[in-house]
Design a protein with these regions (language model features):
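A composition-biased, non-transmembrane "mature-region" signal
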Residues: 1-19
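Short, surface-exposed, charged/polar-biased interaction segments
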Residues: 39-42, 87, 91, 223-230
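Juxtamembrane "helix exit" motif at the C-terminal ends of alpha-helical transmembrane segments
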Residues: 78-101
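Serine-dependent carboxylesterase/thioesterase catalytic core
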Residues: 139, 144-235
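The conserved beta1-alpha1 loop
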Residues: 1, 22, 172-174
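Transmembrane alpha-helical segments and their cytosolic interface motifs
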Residues: 69-81
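Active-site catalytic motif of lipid deacylating hydrolases and related acyltransferases
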Residues: 14-72, 94-165, 212
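Generic structural motif
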Residues: 8, 24-26, 207
Length: 235
């Protein structure tokens, strides 16, 4: 996905070209998207983080990464708790007519959960859970299809570095932040970034880098983080 913005500021013309590396399709094809599937992913991901000691390591850090890691889990558990509470309340009302009707209140649960799912574009509980489950499925290693997507986008960045632009800015947001670091490290290792040459800048937004880097199989990400921490030609 790409687009271009032309502008004129104080009599000077500028042009910015934007390209986005889409990978949400990889998550969708590998993760079932139903409500029950999301809760199953939550339990599996929680087990991986707890059993591997990743959650304990995150707890030793400042609260930002901890909040990022726990938010979808807490939100999904809260949604289930609300659904159960409303089901109990509905059952209590039905029991006034007949004691055997109490369990009919359980029919409220799927409707409440579907209601929360409908507003996930604001709550991001299912969205983030799918992202985290995708990264945790291989315990921090990049799946092959994702590696191929990164290699393809790296070629786009290298092409931009060889063009006549003034600057190339690589932005990694949320779950894409750790992917951007691996992409950036590969570009730097290729020798495309030279001192005094075209400026390559990097901006990361979010705390997901830490939630992935502590996973047991995130060897390549930890190697990339170590490599980039020693770079001096980056902005």
């Amino acid at each position: 996905m790409a687009w271009r913005v032309d502008s004129e500021i104080d009599g000077r013309s500028t042009r910015a070209e934007f390209e986005v590396m889409l990978w949400s399709d990889l998550v969708r094809t590998s993760m079932r998207s139903g409500i029950l599937a999301t809760y199953g992913q939550m339990l599996r991901t929680a087990y991986i983080y707890i059993a591997s000691g990743t959650l304990w390591r995150l707890m030793q850090l400042r609260k930002g990464p901890v909040i990022a890691a726990l938010y979808p889990v807490v939100m999904l558990v809260a949604q289930a708790a609300v659904a159960l509470a409303l089901a109990y309340a509905a059952g209590a009302v039905l029991r006034l007519w007949h004691p055997g009707l109490f369990w009919l209140g359980m029919a409220v649960i799927p409707w409440v959960l579907m209601g929360f799912r409908r507003y996930d574009n604001r709550l991001f509980a299912h969205y983030l859970m799918h992202d985290y489950a995708y990264s945790a499925a291989a315990r921090g290693a990049h799946p092959r299809d994702l590696e191929a997507r990164l290699d393809e986008f790296a070629m786009r960045v290298l092409a931009a570095l060889r063009s006549d632009v003034d600057e190339v800015l690589l932005v990694g947001h949320s779950s894409g932040a750790h992917l951007a670091i691996s992409l950036l490290a590969d570009i730097v290792r290729s020798g495309a970034v030279q001192s005094g040459g075209l400026t390559l800048s990097f901006l990361s937004l979010g705390h997901v880098v830490l939630t992935v880097s502590f996973l047991p199989n995130a060897h390549s990400l930890r190697r990339d983080l170590k490599h980039m921490s020693a770079q001096r030609q980056m902005t």
